[in-house]
Amino acid sequence: MKTDFKKIIMKNKIINTFLIFLFGVILGIFSKWLDNLSIDDSVWWQHILGILNLHNVFSLLGIWLLIAITISVFSKTPRRAGINVLCFFLGMTVSYHLYTILFCGFNPMRYMLIWYGFTLISPLLAYVCWYAKGKNKVSMIISSLILSAMFLSSFYIGIWYFDLKSIIDLLIFIETVIVLYVNPKNTI
C-alpha cells in the first residue's frame, strides 16, 4: 500500500515537472515568434497583440524572474523548486534558440550563452527563493532581496529621479509581491 502511494507521488512529480518544461518550451517558441511578428493593425488578432504589447513583455527580464519565482515558491520542497525552475528554463532557452536557428536563419550564440548561464544557476537561485515563503528572519531577508531585484527591474532610479519603466513592469512587480506574500496552499 505504501509503495503504491510513493509511486503515485513520484508519477505526479514527473508529470508536474514535465508540464513545467512544456510550459517553458511553449513560452520560448511564443516569445521568439512574437519577436519576429510584424504587427499589421488591419488584422484583428495582430491589432490585439499590438495593444497588449506582448512582444515587449517577453523581452523583459522581470517576466522571466516572476515566472521562476512563482514556480519556486509554489514547489513542495526546495529541491523540487530547483528541478522545476531548471526544467522551465531549459525548455524556454532551448526552444527559443532552436526556433531562432530553424526559422529565423541565424544563431545568436553569444546572446544565448547568457541565458544558458542563467539556466545553469537557476536551480540554486530557485532553491534559495523557495525559503522566501517562510515567516522567519531568513525568509524576510530573501523576500527583501527578491523584491529589491524586481524593484530595480521595474523602476528607473537615480540620485535625482524615480520613474516607472512601464505599466507592465509595475504589474510584474505587484504580482511578485502577491506571489511572495500570499500563503501558497497549493504546491506543484
Language-model features: locations:
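Membrane-proximal helix-loop-helix units in multi-pass membrane proteins
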Residues: 90, 94-152
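Juxtamembrane "helix-exit" motif on the non-cytosolic side of transmembrane helices
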Residues: 33-41, 97-106, 154-162
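Terminal transmembrane helical module of multi-pass membrane proteins
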Residues: 141-188
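Lipid-exposed faces of alpha-helical membrane segments in multi-pass integral membrane proteins
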Residues: 19-26, 87, 91, 95, ...
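Alpha-helical transmembrane segments of polytopic membrane proteins
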Residues: 17, 51-64, 110-121, 165-176
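Membrane-water interface at the C-terminal end of transmembrane alpha helices
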Residues: 16, 124-138, 176-188
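N-terminal topogenic module of multi-pass integral membrane proteins
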Residues: 1-81, 85-86
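Cytoplasmic juxtamembrane regions at transmembrane-helix boundaries
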Residues: 77-102, 158-162
